[in-house]
Design a protein with these regions (language model features):
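Active-site loops and adjacent core secondary-structure elements that bind or stabilize anionic groups
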Residues: 1
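Conserved catalytic-core segment of NTP-binding enzymes
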Residues: 4-92, 97, 101
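Exposed alpha-helical structural elements
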Residues: 79, 88, 115, 119-122
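C-terminal boundary of histidine-terminating zinc-finger modules
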Residues: 105-114
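C-terminal alpha-helix
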Residues: 119-134
Length: 135
């Protein structure tokens, strides 16, 4: 459906795709110039990022960035920093019970967790800086 929409230069479309690589072979990546891969602090998740990055390059996607999710402590942050190149890492979203509470109540985390909103704003600022450099 999104391919049929008229987009203008500078427009942004965000697609939340299923975990894994299967969707990449279905033409869903056509016309995309960057991916944001959400990982968790674990070896399988890091390997998925590496596979996505390799396939993205083959498909002509120039940039693959990472948001690390469900970070519990400094060990998790250090694990991610050790395995993800600094230029690809957009930031961290820490494990947060308020997010789970919001989901159970059918509420947006944006309305429920100031700390999550602050972390997401930091990530958005990083994305904006990258976009400014690309212009």
């Amino acid at each position: 459906v999104y391919k049929r929409q008229v987009l203008h230069r500078g427009d942004v479309v965000v697609l939340d795709m299923e975990a894994g690589l299967e969707h990449m072979g279905r033409g869903t990546t056509e016309g995309m110039d960057q991916f944001i891969v959400v990982i968790e602090p674990g070896s399988r998740s890091v390997q998925t990022y590496k596979n996505v990055k390799r396939l993205a390059k083959d498909l002509g996607v120039k940039q693959v960035h990472v948001v690390a999710n469900k970070i519990r402590d400094e060990k998790d942050e250090e694990f991610v920093k050790t395995h993800i190149p600094a230029e690809d890492l957009l930031g961290f979203i820490h494990y947060n019970t308020e997010i789970m509470d919001a989901d159970r109540q059918g509420c947006s985390p944006y309305d429920y967790s100031k700390s999550a909103v602050d972390e997401i704003r930091k990530i958005k600022t990083t994305i904006d800086k990258i976009d400014d450099c690309d212009k």
